[in-house]
Amino acid sequence: MSEAAHLVQYIVVPYRAAAEGVAPGEIRPASSEFGAIRIANSMASKFAGVAAYEVLVDKETGDMQSPRILAQIGTVPALDD
């Protein structure tokens, strides 16, 4: 698939405490890298952990790939390789 078939997006994922560690909450979109980091910082006190990511989104399927961590606050699970 070509790069043109992908779109860069910024997302923030809050994580709540769960019996097995942490569980992801609702993904929040951001308009920029700076915005994602700002949102993550503002949410940090309300969750066990928060992470801001830059991801490539397949325009056809909506699948997210190649996450890059922009900010990680509190307890956040490791990205799968």
Task: Label every PLM stretch briefly.
Residues M1-S2, P14, I37-N41, L56-K59:
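Intrinsically disordered, low-complexity boundary segments flanking structured domains
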Residues S2-P24:
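Short aromatic-glycine-(Arg/Gly/Cys) micro-motifs in beta-strand/loop hairpins
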Residues A30-G49:
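A short, charged, amphipathic alpha-helix used as a generic interaction element across diverse proteins
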